[in-house]
Amino acid sequence: MLFRSGLGGRLDSTNALGNPVVSVITRIGYDHMNILGNTIEEIAQEKAGIIKAGVPVVIAPQESEALAVLQRAAAAKGVSARCVQENDLQRAKALQPGLLGAYQRENAATAMCAAQVAWTGCRIEKEKMKTVIARGIHRAVWPGRMEILSTEPFLMVDGAHNSNGIHALRTSLEELYPEEKFHFVMGVMADKDYEKMIGELLPLAMDFVTVTPESARALQGETLAEDIRKQGVPAHAITKVAEIPELLTPKEKTIALGSLYFIGELKSVYQNRA
């Protein structure tokens, strides 16, 4: 059974579970800064709170500042830190992950390393372990992450909601659809660095439609559209997520993103249309 920390690590409720078989720290970026801190080092220190004495930790590729914090925390607890390396990334790529996105190869490599560490000492044949890992990576699904809801007209949804996530999405779109431009539909929380998120998307954008997600923390769609227009890109706000399917353009690609709240609403619209 796998438990995911909801926020940070040091004060997260998952710490009440006792000692796991393995702890895993994925790539650290700027998010929840009002709680976790304003620098990568501060955020990494909070994430390092899941590292426990006697429990090995797997660490995904990190910025050097974050990696140094995590390795010091592991050393202080006297545990081994298995850092995902380039050869792990290449092995994961060869397994053909079922999830779209260049960043999913990194996630797959991290999951592969975590499984190997968790099974260390277990009576599992090496070849069987390889088969199970390969099958899991190939069959993995992740609703709301580069998920294609419609192929014609094309609509992809992605729950990326911070600048790191948007950058990963942009890189993946450039790899999957080189030289293409996109219509973006965007809804964000007001406490996110949405200006940096917009900046990541501008080079790939034909235009934007903005919405106000159903959350007390939501940024008003018109405010977001106004900020985008200041960058010289067409943008207008709509009041209902249910309008989005009617806005799609044949033979062109639309990407909806910016908030898991918004993506959840849009997925519900499509499920109700089925």
Model-derived features: positions:
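Generic C-terminal helix-cap and adjacent flexible tail
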Residues: 121-124, 268-274
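Structural motif
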Residues: 60-62, 159-160, 186-189, 213, ...
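Short amphipathic alpha-helical segments
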Residues: 12-16, 36-38, 70-71, 168-170, ...
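Flexible active-site lid/hinge loop adjacent to a nucleotide/diphosphate
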Residues: 1-61
